[in-house]
Each structure stands twice: as C-alpha cells, then as structure tokens.
C-alpha cells in the first residue's frame, strides 16, 4: 500500500515537477495478477486497479493492520468500473458478470471480494475507488445503459464530451462515494474547462483510452497558482479540494472521476472564470 499524506496548498505551489508527481500522480494502476492500492489521507480515499490474468485476485487481511480492520471492506464501500475485457466479481459468493464499462458498487461489510477475467487474452481491468462508510447499502451492478449520459461542450471550444454518472444518488445510494466516466468526442481535447473547485469534496481522475504517443496535461493547483502534471495512458491523479482539476490532451481521451467528501451534490462547486486563471 502506497500512503500519500495530505498537503497544504501553500506547500504544493513550491514543488517542482518531480515533487508534484510524487504527491499527486498514481503512475502504475494495473499490474498483471495483482492489485495496486494508493491510500490518500485526503478524505481517506483508496485508489487502485485490479487486473486478473492467469488467476483470481482479491484483497485479503494483509491490509487490516494499515486500515485498522480485520478485512478490507469492514468499514468501507467500494466502486469498480471495468475498462478491459469481460470479467467477474464474486461478493461473498454472489457472482456478478462485469463486462467492458460495466460497474459494480459493493457495500460496507462484504468480507470476500474476488476478481477474475473470463478470457486471459483480453483480461479485465477493474479500476476502483474505495471510501469510508457509515452504513451498508446493497451491492449493485450498473451498466452503461443505466447511467443517463449527458453531453456537454462544443466542438468550437474543443470540449465536447459525454458524462456518464455511474454512482450518483439518481442511480444508487452510497455513503459518500460518487463515480462516473467522461468520454471526449473525437477531435476534442479539453475536459472541465471552464474549471471549478469544490471545497466539500476531493476528486481523483483516471485517464485512459490514450495512444502511446499521446498525453494529457492535467491542470491543478489553486486558480491563481496553477500547475500541471503530464499524464499518460492508465494513470490517475489526486486532486485536493482546494485544487482545480482540468486537462487538455494531444488527442481525445476518456477519464473516470471519483469523489468523496461531505456531500454528493454534483453541482456543489465553485466555478472559476477562464479570465481569472493564473
């Protein structure tokens, strides 16, 4: 488990390129037949990937000491979106088939969660966010047909994109975790511009669907102290509540956003005009 401490905005603005990457970038999300796990002190979110290839993968009691529990989801809820080939997730013996871009919410208290791929040639890639939970909500599968996609932006401003809200109150109940998937239309490069902050929630972006020769310049920092982190395919970045979170790519891309914090009101954000950015 990679533990990332919280960082003050006054400290963050003094960091160089490598310092910013060390604090906020999750460089390696998927490793064959393993799970990755980054624990952030910011709202206690856990971020990672699970890619079963030749065997099943599960998170066992080995994380208990670091989390202060006897099993992974004893006090946590889990959100998973599959960006790879078809797979399965077994939750306390109940098996769910999770295809490409299907998702699964797992409620607090699930003791055994086992991940598998159906075809080793095209393994599943389960990206997950995990957050502290105060009560148990039912485990539920969510498919792309259930997420009521919303298209925003314009080709003229190069930010035409479709937002798919997987884990939001209109779709299912969670304690605090919200997740979704945003896909840019071909030829469009910007996400979340004009940008915003939200003091009551932190957020993590996971960028994928990118060619090897492409990248995204992820914008972060306070609106008057902006910085950037160069992102490549299948990498994640942690965004504190004081930071903007936007990006521009060399080509179109897709990203998964996940939020935890004080509320789940999607529009509870503080907008920043482009003219006010520095």
Swiss-Prot record:
The gene is kduI. The keyword Metal-binding applies. Keywords: Isomerase, Metal-binding, Zinc. InterPro entries: KduI (IPR007045), KduI/IolB_isomerase (IPR021120), KduI_N (IPR027449), RmlC-like_jellyroll (IPR014710), RmlC_Cupin_sf (IPR011051). It comes from Escherichia coli O139:H28 (strain E24377A / ETEC). Its EC number is 5.3.1.17. This is 4-deoxy-L-threo-5-hexosulose-uronate ketol-isomerase. PANTHER family: 4-DEOXY-L-THREO-5-HEXOSULOSE-URONATE KETOL-ISOMERASE. It comes from the Bacteria. GO terms for molecular function: 4-deoxy-L-threo-5-hexosulose-uronate ketol-isomerase activity; zinc ion binding. Belongs to the KduI family.
């Amino acid at each position: 488990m990679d533990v990332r401490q919280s960082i003050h905005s006054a400290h963050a603005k003094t960091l160089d390129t490598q310092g910013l990457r060390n604090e906020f970038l999750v460089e390696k999300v998927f490793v064959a037949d393993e799970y990755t796990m980054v624990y952030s002190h910011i709202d206690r979110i856990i971020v990672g990937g699970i890619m079963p290839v030749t065997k099943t993968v599960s998170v066992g009691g080995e994380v208990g000491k670091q989390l202060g529990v006897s099993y992974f989801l004893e006090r946590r809820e889990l959100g998973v979106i599959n960006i790879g080939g078809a797979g399965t997730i077994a939750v306390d013996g109940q098996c769910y088939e999770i295809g490409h871009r299907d998702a699964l919410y797992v409620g607090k208290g699930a003791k055994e969660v086992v991940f598998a791929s159906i075809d080793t040639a095209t393994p599943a890639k389960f990206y997950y966010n995990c957050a502290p939970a105060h009560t148990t909500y039912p485990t539920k599968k969510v498919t792309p047909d259930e997420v009521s996609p919303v298209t925003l932006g314009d080709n003229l401003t190069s930010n035409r994109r479709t937002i798919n809200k997987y884990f939001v109150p209109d779709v299912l109940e969670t304690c605090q975790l919200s997740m979704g998937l945003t896909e840019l239309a071909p030829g469009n490069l910007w996400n979340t511009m004009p940008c915003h902050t939200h003091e009551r929630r932190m957020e993590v972006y996971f960028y994928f669907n990118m060619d090897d020769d492409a990248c995204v310049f992820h914008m972060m920092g306070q609106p008057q102290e902006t910085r950037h982190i160069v992102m490549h395919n299948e990498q994640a970045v942690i965004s504190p509540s004081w930071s903007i979170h936007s990006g521009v790519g060399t080509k179109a891309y897709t990203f998964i956003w996940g939020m935890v914090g004080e509320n789940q009101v999607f529009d509870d954000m503080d907008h920043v005009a482009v003219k006010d950015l520095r």
